[in-house]
């Protein structure tokens, strides 16, 4: 199974593609879709859409996983993140890729055993679990963690498996 993990952000959307075959899990590719603060909102969203579609075409994932919505203190920040998240979901849906979502605490717990783990702890565990030689950038590491969370959430009992959004 190939999973595309996406850590949605307007300025630095992390992406990570992970393969799980015959009990072995490997990182296929990871990185980020970067937008500087000089790029307007609509152009940022266009770049995120194009970047996600390009990764889907190149890596052919079976599905995508993203983090569930969290509440920011600033309403404007929440709205912008929601717009970026909508673009990501639409790009996946248009490409025929089902999308699954996980709460941030569940992602951390799935990787480290603790839902209160620090981001640095998550990235270190990602390195161990995927055999990476270098620590991925924060957004890319988060995306790999989100992909691994989906793989760790599968059950042999179909009724217990997560449902796409």
Residue ranges and their predicted role:
Residues 1-165:
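Phosphate- and other anionic-substrate recognition elements at nucleic-acid/protein interfaces
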């Amino acid at each position: 199974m190939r999973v595309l993990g996406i850590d949605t952000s307007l300025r630095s959307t992390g992406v990570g593609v992970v393969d799980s075959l015959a009990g072995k899990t490997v990182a296929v590719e990871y990185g980020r879709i970067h937008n500087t603060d000089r790029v307007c909102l609509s152009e940022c969203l266009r770049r995120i859409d194009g970047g996600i579609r390009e990764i889907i075409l190149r890596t052919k994932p079976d599905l995508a996983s993203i983090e569930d919505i969290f509440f920011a203190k600033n309403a404007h920040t929440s709205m912008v993140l929601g717009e970026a998240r909508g673009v990501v979901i639409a790009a996946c849906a248009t490409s025929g890729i089902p999308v699954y979502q996980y709460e941030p605490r569940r992602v951390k717990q799935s990787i480290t055993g603790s839902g209160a783990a620090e981001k640095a702890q998550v990235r270190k565990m990602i390195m161990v679990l995927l055999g990476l030689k270098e620590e991925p950038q924060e957004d890319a590491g988060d995306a790999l963690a989100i992909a691994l969370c989906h793989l760790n959430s599968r059950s042999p009992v179909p009724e217990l498996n997560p449902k796409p959004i």
